Amino acid sequence: MGVLAAAARCLVRGADRMSKWTSKRGPRSFRGRKGRGAKGIGFLTSGWRFVQIKEMVPEFVVPDLTGFKLKPYVSYLAPESEETPLTAAQLFSEAVAPAIEKDFKDGTFDPDNLEKYGFEPTQEGKLFQLYPRNFLR
């Protein structure tokens, strides 16, 4: 701590109002209620009895990895990957363009029936809408 900060701390009386309010600050009764970010898995009754609700308990699903050859470790000495991020143009040219070219050569391409290639004319009913955007980036 610097000299000026120590002098300023001596001049200011009372609690430090600039530091972050965590579960370690405050009186013991408050610290017991504040918690550390864990979700509740039940509730307390009027007789101070805790009732656990089965649906609120997190359930971890772990796959069976017997016979799996890869190890869950990547060495920090491993070389950086050389792949560039996938763009929309690359995705279109790899996934949709071959089917459109094939239909165009066969004479069966219909510009009014683009749903065949995965085009969605409306975003209604979608959980994440691209326009108007309804999700955080």
Swiss-Prot record:
Q: Which residues form a coiled coil?
A: none
Q: In which tissues is it expressed?
A: Present in kidney, liver, thymus and testis, and at lower level in brain and spleen (at protein level).
- UniProt keyword Ribonucleoprotein, yes or no: yes
For molecular function, the Gene Ontology terms on record are: RNA binding; structural constituent of ribosome
Q: List the Pfam families.
A: MRP-L27
Q: What is its main location?
A: mitochondrion
Q: Which compartments is it annotated to reside in?
A: Mitochondrion
Recorded family membership: Belongs to the mitochondrion-specific ribosomal protein mL41 family.
Can you say what this protein is called? Large ribosomal subunit protein mL41
Give the organism, scientific name.
Homo sapiens
